């Protein structure tokens, strides 16, 4: 397994690593990025909360490392402008797909 870091930067004053996502090393780069993106989004529950009984967004491959918000509210979804670290290279969530920090499409 390979560990990716999800870094929220789009709406924060400073970058914050919010999760580590374990992915199969044999996946392509785009598949790794898409997996990390999908499983740090709130679609059918809360990706960052483990205490919900019916939580379609829970995935044991995702480890939340940022604290929950006051009152136990979950973390926001990964959005355009956020970053995913694969190995030692960061990729940015783009309007469609992903880009390098230099703006090259993946």
Which role fits each region the language model picked out?
Residues 4, 59-62, 103:
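Low-complexity, intrinsically disordered short peptide segments enriched in small/polar/basic residues
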Residues 25-86:
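Short, conserved turn/kink motifs that form compact alpha/beta structural patches or helix kinks used as
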Residues 73-106:
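Short, compact, well-ordered microdomains
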Residues 1-38:
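N-terminal disorder-to-order initiation segments that are Gly/Lys/Arg-biased
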């Amino acid at each position: 397994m390979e560990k990716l870091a999800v870094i929220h930067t789009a709406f924060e004053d400073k970058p914050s690593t919010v999760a580590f996502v374990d992915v199969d090393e044999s996946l392509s780069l785009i598949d790794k990025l898409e997996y990390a993106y999908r499983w740090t989004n709130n679609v059918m529950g809360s990706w960052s909360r483990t205490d919900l009984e019916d939580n379609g967004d829970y995935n044991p491959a995702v480890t939340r490392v940022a604290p929950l918000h006051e009152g136990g509210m979950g973390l926001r979804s990964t959005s355009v402008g956020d970053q995913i670290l694969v190995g030692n290279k960061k990729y940015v969530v783009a309007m469609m797909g992903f880009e390098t920090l230099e703006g090259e499409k993946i």
